[in-house]
Every structure is written in structure tokens, then in C-alpha cells.
């Protein structure tokens, strides 16, 4: 996908919707977008370092493609912000991590793991970085996407949701890639999957889920139409179970082993096979291939 494709998505209605959002919706929109921008910029910088330790040419190629796509995603977020708000508001949103302690802590958790790998460059820190990527791609991104899909189902910011759907398609493949790398390393490097090391990875996953739930309750809580703190918590715990079991380790939690009934709309909004066509663009947005990938996760 070309970067120019991003500007084919019509955000004129979003420009009108944004000032009319409820205060809680607008605050959540700004903070979640700020977090997603950080995650993509982090990935853009981290993936080239990871690729130095991957010897399989085809996997290396996938990592380079992913790094390129993360840059495209950052452009997409910039396009959204440039369209709906002033340059001053845009900069305020981009740099909220400087003034919002919750956002700074979110960034620090994943950033510290990457920094450890850059400093140590050993097998264990590499494994922890791969797990951190899996958490980032499979929990953090998906939880953020959920909010934008909720706005869209309430008839607001539909262009933003469409941008997110494009990004969601890419993240499906990134998630599949990191899962495949980890599963292959389970076979090739059994010393990296001793009970003690698996416990470290499990603790990372639990901490990622805990932080994401706390973040969701902070930015969404019970103040956004169509969502509440319990729905957010249940969905994120479900994602934690889905990701951990996808690595062959069973479930993290006894509850939320299936997708919550009141959150099935998330999958429907992100479902690549759900063909939607923008009347003005007359362009299909079905992505059958990426959905086939995510079904295995």
C-alpha cells in the first residue's frame, strides 16, 4: 500500500465530528491516538535492530516490510491530526506523554524492554523483546483500535475508523509474524523456554494486560457511549488469553477465554471480509488474506 493511499480516505465528516465529540470521547481520542503514534514510532526504530539477529532471509524481508508499514501508519495518524485539528492541537496531542503520567508510564514499560535489548544484545533480552512485540501488536494496538470502531458504530469519526481498519489489516500480519518467530524459536532454542524463562514471559504478558486495563479505565472508564470499564477489562483479558494460548502456553485467566458477547462488534468492524464501500470513493475495503491469517491466532 502506498502512503498516498492514506489521503484517499475522506475525513471531511471527521473534521465536522471532532469538535462535536463529547468531552470524554475527545479526550480518549487524543490520548489513544497519542499512544498509537508512540507505538508505531517505537516499532519503526526497533525493527531494524531486531532484523540483525534474524538469519532467515524471508523473515528478514517481512521485518523490513513491517518497518516500512509502521512508518506509513505514522503518516496515517499525522494525516488524521492534520485534517481534524489545528497545528497547535496536533502538537499537543503528539507530545501528551510529556505531561500525562499515565501515558509516560505506558511508553516506559515497552521502551525499557527495548532499551535492555539494545544494551545487552543477548539471547534472553532478544526473547523478551520478541514477547514485548507480541504484546504490543496483539494487545496494545487492538485495544486502541476498539475505541475508534466504537466511535464509528455510534456514527462518529467514520473516516478515522476506516484509517484504523487499514492499519488493523497490517497489524494482523505483524502479529502473525511475531507469533511464528516465537513458535519457531521454541523448537530451535529450547534453553530460552525453560520454566523459569516462560514465567518471565508470562509475567510480561500479565503486566501488559494489567497496564492496558488500567489505561482503558483511565481514558475510557464509564464516560464513553457504547463502552464501560468492565467491557474494556473483559475484552483485554480475552486478548491476553488469546495471545498467550496462541503461543501454546494455555490461558492466563480462568475467565474471558472466549470473546465477550457484548464485544463481538469489534471483530465485525475489523473483519477484513466484511465488505464496505465508501459511496464517494466506490472502493472496496475487503482484506480477505489478512483475516485468514488472524483466524489462526
Describe the residue ranges of each PLM region.
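Acidic/His metal-coordination segments adjacent to aromatic residues that form catalytic metal sites
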Residues: 12-35, 52, 93-135, 152-158, ...
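Alpha-helical bundle segments that constitute or directly flank the non-heme di-iron/ferroxidase center
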Residues: 24-53, 72-75, 126-151, 173-177
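Long, hydrophobic, well-ordered secondary-structure blocks that form the structural core
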Residues: 43, 49-118
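Inter-helical turn/loop segments and adjacent helix faces that build the functional surface
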Residues: 49-61, 83-91, 117-130, 146-166, ...
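Alpha-helical scaffold segments in carbohydrate-active enzymes
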Residues: 65-83, 99-102, 109, 136-146, ...
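Extended, helix-rich structural scaffolds rather than catalytic motifs
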Residues: 190-297
Amino acid at each position: 500500500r502506498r502512503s498516498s493511499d492514506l489521503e484517499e480516505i475522506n475525513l471531511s465528516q471527521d473534521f465536522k465530528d471532532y469538535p462535536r465529540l463529547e468531552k470524554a470521547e475527545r479526550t480518549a481520542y487524543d490520548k489513544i491516538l497519542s499512544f498509537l503514534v508512540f507505538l508505531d514510532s517505537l516499532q519503526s526504530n526497533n525493527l531494524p535492530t531486531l532484523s540483525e539477529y534474524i538469519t532467515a532471509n524471508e523473515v528478514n524481508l517481512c521485518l523490513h516490510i513491517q518497518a516500512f508499514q509502521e512508518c506509513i501508519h505514522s503518516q496515517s495518524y499525522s494525516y488524521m491530526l492534520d485534517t481534524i485539528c489545528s497545528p497547535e492541537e496536533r502538537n499537543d496531542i503528539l507530545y501528551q506523554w510529556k505531561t500525562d503520567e499515565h501515558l509516560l508510564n505506558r511508553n516506559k514499560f515497552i521502551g525499557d524492554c527495548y532499551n535492555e535489548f539494545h544494551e545487552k544484545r543477548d539471547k534472553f533480552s532478544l526473547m523478551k523483546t520478541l514477547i514485548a512485540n507480541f504484546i504490543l501488536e496483539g494487545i496494545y494496538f487492538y485495544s486502541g483500535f476498539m475505541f475508534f470502531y466504537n466511535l464509528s458504530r455510534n456514527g462518529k469519526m467514520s473516516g478515522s475508523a476506516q484509517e484504523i481498519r487499514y492499519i488493523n489489516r497490517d497489524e494482523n500480519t505483524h502479529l502473525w509474524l511475531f507469533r511464528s518467530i516465537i513458535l519457531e524459536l521454541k523448537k530451535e532454542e529450547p534453553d530460552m523456554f525453560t520454566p523459569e524463562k516462560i514465567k518471565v514471559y508470562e509475567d510480561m504478558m500479565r503486566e501488559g494486560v494489567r497496564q492496558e486495563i488500567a489505561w482503558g479505565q483511565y481514558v475510557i472508564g464509564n464516560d464513553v457511549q457504547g463502552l464501560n470499564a468492565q467491557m474494556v477489562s473483559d475484552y483485554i483479558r480475552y486478548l491476553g488469553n488469546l495471545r498467550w494460548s496462541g503461543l501454546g502456553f494455555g490461558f492466563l485467566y480462568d475467565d474471558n477465554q472466549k470473546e465477550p458477547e457484548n464485544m463481538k462488534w469489534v471483530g465485525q468492524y475489523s473483519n477484513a471480509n466484511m465488505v464496505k464501500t465508501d459511496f464517494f470513493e466506490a472502493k472496496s475495503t475487503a482484506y480477505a488474506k489478512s483475516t485468514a491469517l488472524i483466524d489462526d491466532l
